[in-house]
Amino acid sequence: MMHPSGAVLKDAVERCQGFSANLREPLRRLEVARGRVVLVIGCGDPLLMASCEPVRPWRRYSSFLVGADHAPLLTEHRGTRLCIDVGLAPWAAGEILGEGVREIGRQPVPLEAFLGRKAERLAESLAQVCTWQARFSLVERFLVQSRKQTRQPARGEIRWAWEMIERTGGRIAVTALSRRLGWSHRHFVACFRAHTGICPKAAARHMRLVRAARMLAREPDMDLGMVASRCEFADQSHFTREFHRLAGCAPGAYRRFLEIGATSPLTRP
């Protein structure tokens, strides 16, 4: 279930979704980085996750954070689980969760390791409310309160640069952004990374991947060469290499995974 962000968080929250499942058989998915920090608050049976590149063993997570540049992840779930998934612009994640969120790296981080007892109390509160509206309101209050307490606003120039990268689907040159700000390239890259935890070139790569992944999902019959062209990759070979580097599989394998739905294109690590 999708939830529209309130006015206070509209600039920060790019997506807020609720999920509820009771599964007898395991469901496996491939999760690729989409250039945003993802906060997941969950209760019930934990989620199994394993990094694909580099290969890591399966670990159990209930509530967790993943960074904007996380490694391709396999997730597997069986049983009863309820969670809310919040996608945050990386600059906003720093405003809400503190600058430490910019250093979480490419692997998932258990939320309790980042927020301590606050994470456990949040999950317990989520388990006690019975409607989606109440659950979304609970999470929204947490985000608003955390933002007020952190008091680490991102620079307006970085927020603007992030919006431009996102609006163009990663197709704007980093040098064009620094020129429009009147900054040196080196200063812009350093400042962008300090506020988001990711360099602007990596952000653009992920935005372009998101655009390509959406096109693969929405246009199942479109030729891969056409997808590469529309997303402004140099050619299909470049598209395949870049997609594999960021998603852990080739675009054709990803498309087949979407068609199957419940089976990952990757083997279990």
Question: What do the PLM-derived regions correspond to, one by one?
Answer:
Residues 1-185, 195-199, 214-218, 223-234, ...:
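Alpha-helical bundle regulatory/interaction domains
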Residues 182, 203-206, 237:
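Conserved structured core elements
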Residues 192, 204, 242-244, 255:
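DNA major-groove recognition helix of helix-turn-helix
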